[in-house]
Amino acid sequence: MKTNKLKQQKGTLLRVLQYVKPYRVLVIVSLLCACVSAAAQLLIPILTGKAIDQMLGAGQVNLSGVLVFAVWIAVVAALSAIAQQFLATSNNKIAYNISRDLRNAAFHKLQRLPLSYLDAHPSGDLVSRMIADVDTFSDGLLMGFTQLFTGVVLIVGTLTIMLIKNWMIALLVVVLTPLSMFVASFIARKTHHYFTEQARVRGQQTALINELIEGQKVVQSFGHEAASLSDFNCINDELGRVSLNATFFSSLTNPSTRLVNNIIYAAVALVGALSAVGGGISVGDLSVFLSYASQYAKPFNEISGVVTELQNALACAARVFSLLDEDDRVPDKENAVVLSPKGTVDLKDVCFRYVPDRPLIEGFNLHVKPGQRIAIVGPTGCGKTTMINLLMRFYDVNSGAILVDGTDIRDATRHSLRKSFGMVLQDTWLKAGTIRDNIAYGRPDASEEDVIAAAKAAHAHSFIRRLPDGYDTVITENGGNISQGQKQLLCIARVMLGGENGELPPMLILDEATSSIDTRTEIKIQSAFARLMNGRTSFIVAHRLSTIQEADVILVMKDGHIIEQGTHEELLKKQGFYANLYQSQFALS
C-alpha cells in the first residue's frame, strides 16, 4: 500500500516537472538568484567574524577595520535583498504560469469529456478541482521554489565552509543532521494522506454548496432547511476532522525539526567553546561557526515546512491529473463526413442503456422524411429525452445506427451534425452577458435588426423593451434576474436567429420548449414555431399533448419502445395509450 502511494507521489511529481519544463529559463534565473542570495548570506557571518577579530579587547579596537567590514556587510546584505526580490519575482512567474497552464488543460479537458462523465460527477467537485485545488497547488509550488532553492544552496554552502574552517566540528553537525531529516520525512508521509482526504472532502463540500444554492427555492418550499443544514454540518464536520489531522501533523514539522536543530546548535557551541579555550579557533571563527550552525539549521526548518506544503500541493495536483486522465469522448473519424442534410433521419434497430444491466431503448426503428414534424410523447423515463441525446450524439448508441440523409452520424463530424439542428430545451441555459449576447450566441456577428427580429418572432421583444437597459441588460449567472419563462423565450429567440450566415438549420429539436411559458404567449409561440418548422424536419418532445396536435406523426413511447404511432386524430380513434393519456390530461385541466 505504501509502495503504491510512493509510486503515485513520484508519478505526480514527474508530471508536475513536465509543466515546469517550458519555464526552464526562469528556473535557471531562480537558481542563479538563489545562489547569489545564499552566497551573500554565507559571506555575512565571515565578515562579521573578521569584524569581531578587529576587537581584541578594551582599548584594542581597530575602528577603521571594523568600519570597512561594516560597509562590506551592508553591501552584501543589500545584494542579498536584491537577489531575493528577483528570486521572488521569477518564482511567482513560474508558479502562476504553471497554474494557468494546468487550469487551461483542465478546462480544455472538460470540453472533450463525454457527457456521461459530466452527468456522473457533481459540477461543484469539478469546479473545486479547477479552482481550489489548482490554487492550493500553485501556493505549494511557489513556496517550494522560493524556499527550496535557497535552502539547498545554503545547506551545501554552509557545510562546505564549516568543513574548511574546522572539519571536526563540521563532522559533528553532519552526524546529527539526519535526525532532522528523519523527523521531517516521517511527518511528511503522514500529512500526504490527510491532505489527499482534505482535497477530496473539500470537493464534496463545494458540490453540496453549489447544489443547495441552485436549488434554494425548492429547499425552502419543502421546508428542507434543517435537513440541508444537517447534510452540510455532516460534511463540514468531516472536512474539519481531516483538516485538523492534516494541520496537526503538518504543525509538528517545524517544532520537531527546530528541537533537533537546537540540539545541533548547542553541541556546536559546546565543542567550539572548548576548542576556543584551548586555542584551536579564534573567538571570531567561533562566532562564524555559531552563525553557520544556526544558518545550517534554518533551511532544514524551512524545507521541512516546504515538504509539508508540497504534500498538500501534490495531493491537489493528483486530483487535477485524475481529471486529465479521464478518457476523452470518442473522437471524430479521420475521414468523417461534413453533413449538409436535407432532413431525412433513420433510426435502425437502436439499442441504448446508461447502465449496462438496465436497458432503456431496445430495437427502436423509425423513418423520418424531410420536413416531417415528429412528436414524441410518453410517461416520464420512457426514453424521450434520451432520443434527443442520441440524435445530437451526446451519447452513442450501444447497437444499431442513426442515419441522417443515409450517413451514419458516427461517420460524420460532430460539429456539422449539431450545426444541422436548432435546439430549444426545457432546461434553459444562458451565459453571463447581455440579452443581445445571448440571443446572438450562435451568430455573434448578427446585426441589431436581426436580433430584434428574432426576439419579436419569439415574443420576447416586449418584455426586453420594458427592462431598464433593454437589449443591453446584463443577465446574471444562468439568468437569475429574469423569470424562467423569459429565459425560455430568449432560448427560442436564439434558435430563431439562426446559426452561421443567418441560415436556419434544416432540423429542429424542441424538448418541452414552451413548458415555462404562460398559455397566451404559448399560443403565439406555437404560430412562430409553425413558421419555423415549415419545411424542416422537427422532433418535438412534449408532456402537454395540446402542443403537438398538428404533428405529422406522433410517436408514443413506453419502456424504450414505440407502442403507438400516427396522427393525433388516428391515435384518438384507436382508444389506446395515447387516447387515455390525452383524456386524463384534459380531465385534469
PLM region descriptions:
Residues 1-41, 56-69, 87-91, 95, ...:
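Membrane-integrated ABC transporters
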Residues 2-6, 96, 104-128, 132-134, ...:
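Short intracellular "coupling" helices and adjacent cytoplasmic loop segments at the cytosolic face
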Residues 12, 20, 52, 87, ...:
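Juxtamembrane loop-to-helix connectors within ABC transporter transmembrane domains
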Residues 22, 26-39, 72, 76-79, ...:
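Transmembrane helices of ABC transporter permease
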Residues 72-80, 84, 177-184, 250-264, ...:
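Hydrophobic alpha-helical segments in the permease module
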